[in-house]
Amino acid sequence: FFLIADYQALGDHLNDIDLIRDSVLQVTLDWLAVGLDPEKSAFVIQSYVPEFAELTMLLSFITPLGMLERNPTLKGELADLDIERRSVGFFNYPMSQVADILLPQAHLVPVGDDQLPHVEMTREVARKFNRMFANVFPEPDSLVGRVPRLSGTDGQGKMSKSKGNVIMLSDDEKAVTKKVRSMFTDPNRIRADIPGKVEGNPVFQYHDAFNPNTAQIDDFKARYREGNIGDVEIKMALAEAINTFLDPIRERRAYYESNMSLVEEAIMDGVARMRVIAAETMKQVRDAMRISSYTKNWK
């Protein structure tokens, strides 16, 4: 299951619904462009499945406030948010993320390493529900990729569209090259003959992720540490590698942009499949909590 969490996007984009609407389309196009098969993977818009909201509400009653307050992602985002925009809905979005995982009864969740605490929180909530009521939810495991997180192109935290430090899957060759040329490197290396730091350097992080030529990467790293290579050579090789990686993605994206009925079909089919599973999960939840049949014996 691949989820577009549009409810959660309301937390900091409530006054820009058009942005959310466009993002739903762009994310779906990205999924199709990278080769996800909608017959094997269900694409789901969160608000199209009301059981997500219901499960969020029910699980919030068994979740201590302190568990949300300890969530590192929430703490960081609250610090960056004006106090007037700190809504109850925004504060509760980690609970919504828990429901995102538990409603389809997921066993494995692909995440970046910054989301590991969230999956652990989901496991805690699942354990507590199962202990209090009935064994309904599996405890999901995390799946972290070979590159657990990509830094932003400016070296400031992870990629963020709002911060403008991101390379989009839809970027053309010229845009990618421009962004790569301006990427943050080692700030202490002001000349090509000064030894540089590879560790934590976004340019090398991206090489590791997108450049299949490992011999070239090893050569670049060795020469960079020795002060025998300039940033421009490394960045131009990276731009070429990323553009080569993106070429088939751009081609598939153009196809789906010309066949929007297939995009809508992918979403609606995924939502329909999710609704079947969601209904069964919520029946188990309501039965376990004994809130599904108040009037059963009213005779």
Indicate where each model-derived feature is located.
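Internal, conserved structured core segments that host functional sites
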Residues: 73-76, 80-125, 129, 133, ...
